Amino acid sequence: MTVLHVQEIRDMTPAEREAELDDLKTELLNARAVQAAGGAPENPGRIKELRKAIARIKTIQGEEGDLQENE
Protein backbone atom coordinates (compact mmCIF):
# COMPACT_ATOMS: atom_id res chain seq x y z
CA MET A 1 0.00 0.00 0.00
CA THR A 2 1.38 3.38 -0.94
CA VAL A 3 1.09 6.78 0.65
CA LEU A 4 -2.22 8.48 -0.04
CA HIS A 5 -1.86 12.00 -1.34
CA VAL A 6 -4.48 14.66 -0.72
CA GLN A 7 -5.54 14.92 -4.37
CA GLU A 8 -6.04 11.15 -4.57
CA ILE A 9 -8.27 11.28 -1.50
CA ARG A 10 -10.27 14.22 -2.86
CA ASP A 11 -10.85 12.32 -6.13
CA MET A 12 -12.45 9.42 -4.23
CA THR A 13 -16.18 9.19 -3.66
CA PRO A 14 -17.38 9.36 -0.04
CA ALA A 15 -17.99 5.59 -0.08
CA GLU A 16 -14.48 4.92 -1.38
CA ARG A 17 -13.03 7.17 1.33
CA GLU A 18 -14.97 5.31 4.00
CA ALA A 19 -13.79 1.94 2.67
CA GLU A 20 -10.18 3.14 2.52
CA LEU A 21 -10.47 4.50 6.06
CA ASP A 22 -11.70 1.12 7.32
CA ASP A 23 -8.83 -0.66 5.56
CA LEU A 24 -6.25 1.72 7.02
CA LYS A 25 -7.69 1.40 10.53
CA THR A 26 -7.53 -2.40 10.27
CA GLU A 27 -3.95 -2.28 9.03
CA LEU A 28 -2.99 0.10 11.85
CA LEU A 29 -4.62 -2.20 14.41
CA ASN A 30 -2.63 -5.16 13.09
CA ALA A 31 0.64 -3.19 13.07
CA ARG A 32 0.09 -2.05 16.64
CA ALA A 33 -0.73 -5.61 17.73
CA VAL A 34 2.57 -6.85 16.29
CA GLN A 35 4.39 -4.03 18.05
CA ALA A 36 2.63 -4.69 21.37
CA ALA A 37 3.43 -8.40 21.18
CA GLY A 38 7.11 -7.52 21.03
CA GLY A 39 7.58 -8.42 17.40
CA ALA A 40 9.66 -6.39 15.02
CA PRO A 41 7.47 -4.64 12.46
CA GLU A 42 8.35 -5.11 8.81
CA ASN A 43 8.43 -1.35 8.28
CA PRO A 44 8.81 0.70 11.47
CA GLY A 45 7.67 3.92 9.77
CA ARG A 46 4.45 2.36 8.55
CA ILE A 47 2.52 3.08 11.78
CA LYS A 48 3.23 6.82 11.46
CA GLU A 49 2.33 6.69 7.77
CA LEU A 50 -0.99 4.96 8.54
CA ARG A 51 -1.87 7.48 11.24
CA LYS A 52 -1.22 10.38 8.87
CA ALA A 53 -3.26 8.81 6.06
CA ILE A 54 -6.19 8.27 8.45
CA ALA A 55 -5.94 11.90 9.58
CA ARG A 56 -5.88 13.13 5.98
CA ILE A 57 -9.01 11.17 5.10
CA LYS A 58 -10.86 12.37 8.20
CA THR A 59 -9.85 15.98 7.51
CA ILE A 60 -11.13 15.84 3.95
CA GLN A 61 -14.32 14.13 5.10
CA GLY A 62 -14.88 17.01 7.51
CA GLU A 63 -14.18 19.62 4.86
CA GLU A 64 -16.57 18.02 2.39
CA GLY A 65 -19.26 17.17 4.94
CA ASP A 66 -18.91 13.39 4.63
CA LEU A 67 -18.65 12.79 8.37
CA GLN A 68 -21.63 11.48 10.26
CA GLU A 69 -22.66 13.36 13.37
CA ASN A 70 -21.89 10.48 15.77
CA GLU A 71 -18.19 10.21 14.88
From Swiss-Prot:
The keyword Ribonucleoprotein applies. Signal peptide: none annotated. GO terms for molecular function: rRNA binding; structural constituent of ribosome. SUPFAM superfamilies: Ribosomal protein L29 (L29p). The keyword rRNA-binding applies. GO terms for cellular component: cytosolic large ribosomal subunit. Transmembrane segments: none annotated. Keywords: Ribonucleoprotein, Ribosomal protein, RNA-binding, rRNA-binding. PROSITE patterns: RIBOSOMAL_L29 (PS00579). GO terms for biological process: translation. InterPro entries: Ribosomal_protein_uL29, Ribosomal_uL29, Ribosomal_uL29_CS, Ribosomal_uL29_sf. Part of the 50S ribosomal subunit. Interacts with protein L23. Stabilizes the tertiary rRNA structure within the 23S rRNA domain (domain I) to which it binds. Located at the polypeptide exit tunnel on the outside of the subunit. Belongs to the universal ribosomal protein uL29 family. This is Large ribosomal subunit protein uL29.
